Amino acid sequence: MANASICTIGDEILIGQIVDTNSSHISQALEEIGVKVTRMTSFGDDHDEIVCNLTNELTHNEIVITTGGLGPTKDDITKAALAEISGSKGYVVNESQLKMVHEILHARGLDVLDINKAQALVPDTCEVIVNHLGTAPIMVFRFPKERY
């Protein structure tokens, strides 16, 4: 049985502005497929804190799932922290997610701003699963077991 950690990221979670309901749903889904959740944790929008905490979680679990920290705001720096941890050399535009950003915002009658387009910029070290429900992509990083 694989072990997993669920990490919620965002100052809004820590100050109680948003309630973390994602972890419960994710934990139940993982349990159904035989993955044991060993830890759920939350931390704020601080680059060094994200890097430190995620690196620690990677040393103890085969799977680390993060939620939050990817909104179209300037203070969401989770993507940069993940790029650093994964050894990314830069960002690439994921055209499929960019198309989805346009579709979602146009369906809501909103203009697509540069900050929205930036959601489709992903570290070159990840695979992307297109998010059909929101503008932030689902990024999958694979780390060699011996690395952590």
Where is each model-derived feature located?
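Well-ordered alpha-helical segments embedded in enzymatic catalytic cores
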Residues: 25, 49-53
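Glycine-rich phosphate/diphosphate-binding loop of Rossmann-like nucleotide-binding domains
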Residues: 1-41
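Short glycine-rich anion-binding loops that position phosphate/pyrophosphate groups of nucleotides
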Residues: 11-12, 69-72
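Proline/glycine-rich low-complexity loops and linkers
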Residues: 49, 77-148
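An anion/phosphate-binding loop that grips the pyrophosphate of nucleotide cofactors and donors
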Residues: 61
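Short beta->alpha junction loops
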Residues: 39-49
